[in-house]
Structure formats: C-alpha cells, structure tokens
C-alpha cells in the first residue's frame, strides 16, 4: 500500500441547525475545525416527513429556482 496518499483524519466539531455540537473524526478542514450544518436529520424533509421548510442559506435555492423557473417536463 502506498504511503501518504490518504487525506489526514482528525477531530472536528459539528454544529447542527439547533446549535447542538458534537465532536467526530473527519477529513474535513484541519484539527479543531468547525463544520456548521445547513440541513441535519432534525430538519431534513426525508426524515421529518416533508413538513419542515428548507432554509435558503447562501441563496442556492433561490438561484436554482430563478435559473430553472421556465423549465417544464411535458406538463402544461
């Protein structure tokens, strides 16, 4: 097996949408980095039955909607 080809694996702090924090090991960032989640299991529609509204942090959702607003898939 080749040496030094894998990313560094270290502890990072994960902050969920409700402010809950926990430590986990990850290749994200550097030792002690903080990963702020936009969507987590408590707010994701797949785990909440679709009742939660998605928050548009960073404007990604609105940018997608404006870019593809005129697109239709055969429905009129």
Curated annotation (Swiss-Prot):
A Gene Ontology annotation in the biological process aspect, one of them, is: translation
Q: Which SUPFAM superfamilies match?
A: L28p-like
Q: Which UniProt keywords apply?
A: Ribonucleoprotein, Ribosomal protein, RNA-binding, rRNA-binding
The membrane spanning regions, by residue number, are none
What's a single GO MF annotation on this record?
Answer: rRNA binding
A GO CC term assigned to this protein in UniProt:
ribonucleoprotein complex
Q: Name one Pfam family in it.
A: Ribosomal_L31
Cysteine pairings via disulfide bonds? none
**Alphabetized HAMAP family for the sequence:** Ribosomal_bL31_1
Q: Which family does it belong to?
A: Belongs to the bacterial ribosomal protein bL31 family. Type A subfamily.
Q: What does this protein do?
A: Binds the 23S rRNA.
- Cite the record's note on assembly: Part of the 50S ribosomal subunit.
Q: What is this protein called?
A: Large ribosomal subunit protein bL31
What's the source species for this entry? Answer: Methylocella silvestris (strain DSM 15510 / CIP 108128 / LMG 27833 / NCIMB 13906 / BL2)
Phylogenetic placement of the source organism: Bacteria, Pseudomonadati, Pseudomonadota, Alphaproteobacteria, Hyphomicrobiales
